[in-house]
Structure formats: C-alpha cells, structure tokens
C-alpha cells in the first residue's frame, strides 16, 4: 500500500529527525569511515519530469533520443489521449509526435535495422447483433513503421493467420534481430513467432511455459528470461534449432531479474530491482554497475531503462501517489566520486527493505545536500545468515547507524544497550512528546527511555448493537468471555473461524498469559480454557459462500 502525501511527508520528517539526531551523537566519526569506503565511480542522476500519464506502454532509445508511448485520460473530451513523445538528450527538449491510431493502441515499439520505429498496433473490434447488442468481439494486430524524425507512418502490415499468427493470439513482447526478423511472443498459447522482415513465417517456437521478458543484445541476438528451478533463467533463441538454448551460465545467480535491456558497452543490462549489472555472455559475467538506491531511484518503480551511445543510462519511472500517476525520466551519468559534492554517510541496517522506507530514504537523499543514507540489507539472500551477520556487526561495533527493526525483536537489543534513548534528541530538536500519540511512543519505551519510533499504527476495534451493549466502551478478556456465555444463542463474532478467533484472542491478550518481567507463561488457567471452549464452537473454516445462502446467520441473532 502506498503512503499518501501527508503520511509520506511525516515519514521523511521522522527519518530526517532520526538521521540528524544520530549524527549529533556520532560526532562525525562515521563520516571519516564512509569517505574511505566511497567507490571510485558513482552514477549521478539528472531528472526530467514527464508530467501526468495514466500509462507508459513502451519506451526505446535510438541514438541520443528516447521514444515513449503514453496514454492519459482527457477530462475535457472524455477520451483517452495517446501519442508518442521523444526526448533528445543533446538539445534537452521533448517533442510530441502526432500519432492517430483511432481506437487502437501501441503494444510495443522497436527499432528496425534501417532506423525506422516499428510499432506493434493492437485493435479490438466489437460486433453487434441485429438488435444493436454487443456480441463477442475480436482483436487484430499490425506492424506500423514510423520515421523517427518526421513521425510519418511509412508503412503498415497486418498480422494474421496468413502470416502464421493464430487468430486468438495475444501478442505482448516484440523484438527485432540484426537481420530484421520479428520476434513476437504469444501468451494465449505460449510460443514465439519469428517472422521475416516481409512477415513470412521463419519459425514458431513452442514453449512449455510463459516467459517473463524478451530482449535483444547489442549484436542483435534475441534472448528470453523465464523462471527455472534455481531462479530466473536467461536463454537464447536459437533459430537454427528453432528452440530455446540451455540456460546461460553466469558468475552470479540472480533470483529475481526484473528486466534486461540492450547494451552499448556490454551485451545487455540486467536489473534485479536493487542493482544494475552489465552482462558479458562470452565471459559469463555479471559486472555490477550501481545500486538503484545509491542513484536515488526506487528500483520497484523502474518501467524502462537503457544505455545511450556515450554510456549514460536513461531510466523511466512511474510513481502513483494515490491520486495521479507521475512519470519521470532520469539520466544517470557515471562520474568519479572525487568530482561529486561529498555528503556525510549514514547507514540504515535492515533484514528486508520495505518499499515505503525505500521511497522515504530516496526523498530524504534528494532533499538533503549534506547527508546521504545508504542501506545495508542483511537478509536479502538468506534470512538466517543475514541475522547472524547483523548480530556480529552489532557485537563488533561495526553495525549500522540506524536499524529498521520491523523484522527484529528490538527489546533484545535495547536491553543490551545497543540503541540510543531518543527522548533527549527529541527535546533538543524541539519535538514534543505531547504532540504525538503518547501511548504509542510508550510502546517503544523501556525503563522510561525511547528506543524506537514508528511512523504509523493501526487500531482494531469491535462494534455492536447499543441495545445490547449499552454505554460499554471497552472490556477485559474476562468481561468479553462473560458476555459470550450470556449470549450463547447469538452470533457475537460473525464470519470467524476457530483458528482466526484463537489467534485474535490470544495475540491481543498476551499480557493475560505472559509475565514479561519474569518470562513465565501461564496457558493452563481458566481464562485460556474459556477461550479454547469458545473457539471450539466456531466452524473450523469459515465459508464465505454462506453469506449468500439461507444458512447464513439471521441479522437478528447478531449482537
């Protein structure tokens, strides 16, 4: 779930408070260490806002220009507005190319060997009976060819059964190899159609499963990614054998490949949502170029990316803020660290980086000209070994400056004096405890010291009929069980299964059964027995279908 703007602003403010407070406590020591650890080169982002767009359907680069297809709803006309835009990185100007596709849409774009832009056009046609009622429609595909300078459509070719394309085909991925052959993935009956430049069938390669993506290397060879036994596999399309090759072997095993794009300085670029690698097929290597987060980019929001002739990386991201979808074009330039303004480094340690935290860190890094937050994700590859490494770092004094303990038992570390008390820093920064929900802060207290700060919390409550509950505003576990005993013929908690209700009652009443000071547990008393007796009266598994049948509980029985 995305944070709305108000919550996101609060999140960044809280992070900034924590970061600045910590730096005051560290006395700058971390900065000296971070300077020695800076890499020789970093990728520096430059931003170009593309405005509001409901959908960016495809993007490619040709020489120093990026072309992208957009769809956006026009409130004035009540219709979807479509078009192809291009951004020139030399002139720093964007231009909208007029494209009239009628009721159709652009599914994909590619560059032909002669420098034209090939557009895969999809159109759905509804049919009507004699009464004007819509019947089952049908879809059709065509390839249009556009001049990248003038925007003129220079040719149109239909794709149909005459070309060997199935009538019910659903074409998604589309690429063109160095010889001008067209590769089209049909997801309705998994196969790859290979058509010549004049759209004659070259091969129809049947697949046992779906592919994730199709892409081209810098020499025009076509590859696919798909899920295998050990993670995401990369395979080459072998036209000689009319089949996929065996999985390519690389020196790194990437479990999640989120996208591959044609390279200029390498065979192709690989994105695993966290890091971008340069692939060398012959050497079998993935060479790390940069982490998205270090370039102030949320890798989860990357739609398209590629490499320009001069080695710069272009990226298109899309972010939804709850109301609008905002697209942004970035240009990442490789620079020596010594040429870039130095920032004080602060490290956040986490077992798994939540997307909201990631976005907040990026916003902070963009807004601060003095500090930069880097992230060390301990549990990315293996949870247990990551936790072991985290504990070792903390014990040796080389742990992170900040800790995201969403997946940690923070009390174990607080008891050992690992964390700073945040109250003095709040007071020094002018943040008053009474401006927050104090009992939420107190949940992260230990012996009157604040060891954690949450950015949000949820409240679970129960509502019932006032005629039955009266002015009751709350109850203890014992009072609730008394109420259930007094209303055995009523449905106190509808739609609850045994397992769900047992979890709910025990989880929310742990203090009844556990003495947190001594660690003593008491699950053999009368209150716990009453919970077991009550949950046993509930169905083992609740059937949602009962909501719509005569077997559903009558509303008059509910309290």
How would you label these PLM feature ranges?
Residues 99-102, 156-167, 293-295:
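Surface-exposed loop and turn segments in beta-propeller and other repeat-based domains
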Residues 23-25:
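C-terminal motif of bacterial Sec signal peptides marking the signal peptidase cleavage site
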Residues 27-85, 89-92, 103, 107-110, ...:
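Conserved N-terminal structural module of periplasmic/extracytoplasmic solute-binding proteins
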Residues 548-555:
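Conserved small/polar residues in nucleotide/adenosyl-binding loops
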Residues 2-12:
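Bacterial N-terminal signal peptides that target proteins for export
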Residues 88, 147, 151, 445-546:
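Helix-loop-helix "hinge/cap" segment bordering the ligand-binding cleft or interdomain interface
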Residues 408-461, 475-479:
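Hinge/lid segment of periplasmic solute-binding proteins
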Residues 13-21:
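Bacterial N-terminal signal peptides
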